[in-house]
From Swiss-Prot:
Signal peptide: none annotated. It comes from Acetivibrio thermocellus (strain ATCC 27405 / DSM 1237 / JCM 9322 / NBRC 103400 / NCIMB 10682 / NRRL B-4536 / VPI 7372) (Clostridium thermocellum). Coiled coil: none annotated. This is Transcriptional regulator MraZ. HAMAP family: MraZ. It is found in: Cytoplasm, Nucleoid.
Amino acid sequence: MFYGEYQHSVDAKGRVIIPSKFREGLGEKFILTKGLDNCLFAYSLEEWSNLEAKLRSLPFTDKDVRAFVRFFFAGAAEVEVDKQGRILIPQNLREYAGLEKDVYIIGVSTRVEVWDKSKWESYSGDENMSAESIAEKMAMLGI
């Protein structure tokens, strides 16, 4: 399980340090793909395989399912952690998420997310993230 948030910087070559707590769960190689809300999602190879199986079971005849599967898989890349604990974020994924310099790397249960610093600060400060709003949504979900 992944949790917590860490600030790091993307270097001139597009590399970023992955926090050691996250590296342990993700492994030396993992999948990085386009996420929702204009961030990136990172999955361990095992979790990616589980997600792939779930997506494969969805009805291929549904246009929205096909669009979602394309979005998720077309942007995916296998990345490898170097000896300094960094990964190279592919250019297309950096552009998608607007990653230029400062980033937040956050743990979200079964995945890790990589956010542009200003986007994360805006999103996490948004009313959708207020304690009251979250409590209401949790109650609606029976949590």
